[in-house]
Design a protein with these regions (language model features):
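Short connector loops at helix/strand junctions that flank enzyme active sites
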Residues: 29, 42, 50-54
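A generic structural signal for short coil/turn motifs at secondary-structure boundaries
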Residues: 44, 125-129, 222-226
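Anion-binding (especially nucleotide phosphate/pyrophosphate-binding) glycine-rich loop
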Residues: 2-25, 53-159
Length: 232
C-alpha cells in the first residue's frame, strides 16, 4: 500500500467514525535495525532504516474536553476519556499508546484540547518492527500539527518516548522514534545515542546486486511485559 492509498483509506474510515473529514492525517513508518540492538539506552551507535509499513493517525479537534480514540484494526472498540482524567493507567490497552502521547504533550506544557483520533496501524504488532513507536510518532505529529504547536523531529521523539516509558510502562530508549522520524528513502541513519546526532547514510544495496531481506520469525515480543525490561 502506498502512503497515498493509506491516507485515502484512513479518510474513509474517519468519515464512518466521526462523520466528515479529519483536519489532518500523519503517518510514520516502522523500522528495521541493521546494527545496534539495545545500544540506544547504553549510549552506543545504531544503524536503523525505515520500512514501507506505516502507522496512520487522523485527527480532528473537538471542544468538549474529551479524547475519543478508534482503531481500524479494532472496530467497535472505541475508547473515550476526558482529558483531565488521562493519567498513567487510564486508559489501558491499545488506547494507552494514543492517550499517552496526548498526556505527554500536556505534561510538557502544550495546550492540547479534545480530539477525535482514528489510528490505522499497518506495522505488524509484536514483530520487532517498532509498531508502537510508529503509532505514537504519527499521533504526536498529528496532535502538534492540529494545535499549531511548533515541534522538531526530536521533540516528537521525546513525546513518544515519554508516552512509551511513563504512560505505557515500556522502558525503551529513543532509537526507534528517531528512526521513524528521521529515516528517508534509500538511506539508513547512523545514530549516535550519546548525543542523539543523526547522519543520513546511503543504503543502495540493489546497485551492488544485493537485497535486504526482513524475515518474520513469528516470535512475539512485548516491551512492556516481556524480558526487555529485565535485560535492561
Amino acid at each position: 500500500m502506498t502512503v497515498e492509498d493509506g491516507h485515502a483509506s484512513v479518510v474513509d474510515a474517519f468519515d464512518r467514525l466521526a462523520g466528515g473529514a479529519p483536519e489532518c492525517i500523519w503517518s510514520s513508518p516502522g523500522r528495521v535495525n541493521l546494527i545496534g540492538e539495545h545500544t540506544d539506552y547504553n549510549d552506543g551507535f545504531a544503524l536503523p532504516f525505515a520500512i514501507a509499513a506505516r502507522a496512520y493517525a487522523a485527527v480532528r479537534r473537538r471542544d468538549d474536553g474529551m479524547l475519543r480514540m478508534a482503531s481500524v484494526q479494532l472496530p467497535d472498540n472505541d475508547v473515550t476519556v476526558a482529558l483531565d482524567d488521562i493519567a498513567p493507567g487510564t486508559p489501558t490497552g491499545w488506547a494507552a499508546y494514543v492517550a499517552g502521547v496526548v498526556w505527554a504533550a500536556r505534561e510538557a506544557g502544550h495546550e492540547v484540547g479534545g480530539m477525535d483520533v482514528l489510528v490505522d496501524g499497518r506495522v505488524p504488532l509484536g514483530s520487532g518492527l517498532s509498531s508502537s513507536h510508529a503509532l505514537e510518532c504519527a499521533v504526536a505529529a498529528a496532535t502538534v500539527h492540529v494545535h499549531g504547536i511548533e515541534a522538531a523531529h526530536d521533540d516528537l521523539a521525546r513525546l513518544s518516548l515519554t508516552a512509551e516509558n511513563d504512560f505505557v510502562g515500556a522502558p525503551t530508549g529513543m532509537m526507534d522514534q528517531l528512526a521513524s522520524l528521521h529515516c528517508t528513502a534509500g538511506h539508513a541513519i547512523f545514530l549516535d545515542n550519546r548525543t542523539l546526532a543523526v547522519e543520513q547514510v546511503p543504503l543502495d544495496v540493489a546497485s551492488a546486486g544485493l537485497a535486504l531481506m526482513v524475515l518474520d520469525t513469528r516470535v512475539h515480543h512485548d516491551h512492556a511485559e516481556g524480558g526487555y525490561g529485565e535485560r535492561r
